[in-house]
């Protein structure tokens, strides 16, 4: 993971550690949005991983879809 991806993963890990047990596991998608964010940052790095995470969070609302929504694979070689 790039240094930017590590930095962007800190708030996600803090959310999972502090807030997620209190608010419950209510994500409409599988994997959960926080797991998706960490996987996207790991696979795609800071910029693209953050973009994918933002798009996913914007899709996760009561009137949106639900179900299996994996992180897309990288299309280019690193």
Swiss-Prot record:
It is a peripheral membrane protein. Pfam families: YidD. One of its GO terms (cellular component) is plasma membrane. The keyword Cell membrane applies. InterPro entries: Membr_insert_effic_factor_YidD (IPR002696). Keywords: Cell inner membrane, Cell membrane, Membrane. It is found in: Cell inner membrane. Transmembrane segments: none annotated. Could be involved in insertion of integral membrane proteins into the membrane. Belongs to the UPF0161 family. PANTHER family: MEMBRANE PROTEIN INSERTION EFFICIENCY FACTOR-RELATED. This is Putative membrane protein insertion efficiency factor.
């Amino acid at each position: 993971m790039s240094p930017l991806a590590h930095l962007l993963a800190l708030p996600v890990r803090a959310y999972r550690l502090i807030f997620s047990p209190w608010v419950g596991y209510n994500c409409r998608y599988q994997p959960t949005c926080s797991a998706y964010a960490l996987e996207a940052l790991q696979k795609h790095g800071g910029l693209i991983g953050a973009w994918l995470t933002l798009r996913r969070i914007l899709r996760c609302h009561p009137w949106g879809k639900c179900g299996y929504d994996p992180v897309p694979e990288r299309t280019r070689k690193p």
